[in-house]
């Protein structure tokens, strides 16, 4: 619990002034510009859906997973025990870099994760909420890319 509070304080202090929850179309545009549309065969709609269900489009979100003790960082709630510098650091990135609203490090790390054998299934929330959804198109409604 103390670690969580420290991480929350650090993320608050490192979050740029004016950073806030991003709009759906802003997220879609940043992910599109970052090359995620059909990356490894997953449509942009899948990525936007994942971002919503993981963080509600909050690039500075930090949530502790009480089941495994890991902490998720940023838009896609990338876990510290595997992917950033609090654990194995398979993305070669600091966990706090995943909180940047420009999403550059988040997108690059997500690309490494999805290249793994689980694909987007590495995010259980995607499997539950997005994978078999027949309304994925709604995530891009009204967005200009």
Swiss-Prot record:
Q: Which residues form the signal peptide?
A: 1-19
Q: Give the GO cellular component terms, alphabetically.
A: acrosomal vesicle; extracellular space; sperm flagellum
Q: Where is the active site?
A: 54
Matching Pfam families: Lys
SMART domains associated with the record: LYZ1
Compartment(s) of residence: Secreted; Cytoplasmic vesicle, Secretory vesicle, Acrosome; Cell projection, Cilium, Flagellum
Tell me what this protein is called. Lysozyme-like protein 4
* Name of the encoding gene: Lyzl4
